[in-house]
Amino acid sequence: MASRFPKFSRGLSQDPTTRRIWFGIATAHDFESHDDMTEERLYQKIFASHFGQLAIIFLWTSGNLFHVAWQGNFEAWGQDPLHVRPIAHAIWDPHFGQPAVEAFTRGGASGPVNIAYSGVYQWWYTIGLRTNQDLYGGSIFLLFVSALFLIAGWLHLQPKWKPSVSWFKNAESRLNHHLSGLFGVSSLAWTGHLVHVAIPESRGEHVRWNNLLTALPHPQGLGPFFAGQWNVYAQNPDSNSHLFGTSEGAGTAILTFLGGFHPQTQSLWLTDMAHHHLAIAVIFIIAGHMYRTNFGIGHSMKEILEAHTPPGGRLGRGHKGLYDTINNSLHFQLGLALASLGVITSLVAQHMYSLPPYAFLAQDFTTQAALYTHHQYIAGFIMTGAFAHGAIFFIRDYNPEQNKDNVLARMLEHKEAIISHLSWASLFLGFHTLGLYVHNDVMLAFGTPEKQILIEPVFAQWIQSAHGKALYGFDVLLSSADSPAFNAGQTLWLPGWLDAINNNSNSLFLTIGPGDFLVHHAIALGLHTTTLILVKGALDARGSKLMPDKKEFGYSFPCDGPGRGGTCDISAWDAFYLAVFWMLNTIGWVTFYWHWKHITLWQGNVAQFNESSTYLMGWLRDYLWLNSSQLINGYNPFGMNSLSVWAWMFLFGHLVWATGFMFLISWRGYWQELIETLAWAHERTPLANLVRWKDKPVALSIVQARLVGLAHFSVGYIFTYAAFLIASTSGKFG
């Protein structure tokens, strides 16, 4: 018999039911579990797939550039960034009637278009691109790079070019290559681009390939560099009256330490950012020369880890055995990488709005909201993935013999204390926060708002004051005119910082009060509960008192039959599954908070947030209900407008979300019976029964149905909020 899908599993390919297809898809990327898989082939397949991933990323960015150059209004937007709406791409839709065509024809376009809320216009403008020709050039270049990576991926699967396992496990060489080669040199190259192209362009000087080698980025060229007078490069920065993109008010400095924002663009100074990238480059290039490879000098990772034992002997053997454990476990490495990337992505969300790096981004409110929300959701998914792979590590790769009494073993030994402390923190936060919200709700319902319990976040306000925010009157550190830090800041470093932090037109260190105090603790509840579920899932993945042999069952199992009773819902996968709901819940609160605080800030009615955010009805009525009105009016008795697409998406998102419950709340037997009844009917229906199936139809497994339910819940949840966010923000601010 010809081999059927999946080729990687002989057992599955012979399964006579539709389980073959579903389990085949589910395990397609679990290379470790495939037939005849060796360690060497595993590493090589993953390595080659990285090139495919990079090719897709470059193709995608190339597509962004291409569509904006072809169908966008980049040049017109550059002439007036505050009033022209940036176009992402044209819409060709045969269903559009005349009202729709008119509603979606905007941004100076001749036909229906989508508006860009991704911030790419601001980014490309900041880094010195000005014409459609520039965009096409970038697009073609990235297309070429994409093809190059596809070829590289194919090449590294050929016998002559396949790296050996020892090459993959050479930690020091990889560190050197990633630190110096990737981070260091790319940061240096980016500094070069900023200094040679972006900064001159921001001062009205057009540098392209034809004059790159003749246009001096600084009047004195490399003279000060070789003379050791580096401070010359910081002298004569752009003035506060500088008009971005022109020579009016422009200076000559290329590497500065001004702090604060460019008054016109409301973004960080380009010369500050060039300085930052140069510093990063220097640090990382040095860091990439620290590890021992060919010359027998430098650090050995194994020696560093073996040496890390706590003094006194009472805290175990520290990091002994960790090197081999990490170096031989791809899941451990992936878990660490995802945890780092998740934190970085969330930091990007926080910094994109508080310290906007791109010109005019701060004035494009819808883009600000979209970027914040996007990065927080991505961070949530990446972080939960980190714990999932941590749990898989404990099941598949952890060796108790190699890790006797080291930090990993001690985590497992202390798991009851860790889990119960997290549980206690979650309970404390949940009961107290909800108690305060509900108390305040009742007081408002009974017409006695003055009896609310309103707690000022004094510690957070003190921290803001220490960083220079004068509003609260704490008079401490940077907010005290007598402190040495304050005096040094006037001249030596970041003189623009104090102006920025005390300026109400940006989002740096927003003024906070009782509403912020409450929602902060609600978010803390969400974070601690999500962490509790994920940490418990990983620490109990190998076994628990209830099920000591859990690791023999693998990462995901539904139950172990009636014999042991009560072993359902305790696989590591189930913990991950439950945690995703809590993660989405938490990010919902985070994004609601951010968005509501900012729309009141942008509209100049911060009192609305301050007064309504202290009780639950305020959130439901004055944030969700009030801001969904434009959305629901995408269609109305008078026709339609440009928000109609978001009205559709809002409805569709609710539909997808609700569909998730069909999979989550009913169990497998119901579907199996239904399928058998439908199959019976099919076989007895004329004409229909001419169509037969090769695989006997069976219901999804419990775990698979949960995955399908979770996917619908997540996608619907995100679609619904995305439509709400973009429509409510763009409906107010255009």
Swiss-Prot record:
Name of protein: Photosystem I P700 chlorophyll a apoprotein A2
InterPro entries referenced in this protein's UniProt entry, alphabetically: PSI_PsaA/B, PSI_PsaA/B_CS, PSI_PsaA/B_sf, PSI_PsaB
Annotated compartments: Plastid, Chloroplast thylakoid membrane
Record: residues binding [4Fe-4S] cluster: 559, 568
Source species: Physcomitrium patens (Spreading-leaved earth moss)
Residues that hold chlorophyll a B1 according to the record: 654
Keyword Transcription regulation in record: no
Biological processes, Gene Ontology terms: photosynthesis
Keywords from the UniProt entry: 4Fe-4S, Chlorophyll, Chloroplast, Chromophore, Electron transport, Iron, Iron-sulfur, Magnesium, Membrane, Metal-binding, Oxidoreductase, Photosynthesis, Photosystem I, Plastid, Thylakoid, Transmembrane, Transmembrane helix, Transport
Family: Belongs to the PsaA/PsaB family.
EC annotation from Swiss-Prot or TrEMBL: 1.97.1.12
Sites where the protein binds phylloquinone: 671
Catalytic activity, as annotated: reduced [plastocyanin] + hnu + oxidized [2Fe-2S]-[ferredoxin] = oxidized [plastocyanin] + reduced [2Fe-2S]-[ferredoxin]
Lineage, broadest ranks: Eukaryota, Viridiplantae, Streptophyta, Embryophyta, Bryophyta
Binding site for chlorophyll a B3: 662, 670
GO terms assigned for molecular function: 4 iron, 4 sulfur cluster binding; chlorophyll binding; electron transfer activity; magnesium ion binding; oxidoreductase activity
UniProt membrane topology term: Multi-pass membrane protein
HAMAP family for this protein: PSI_PsaB (MF_00482)
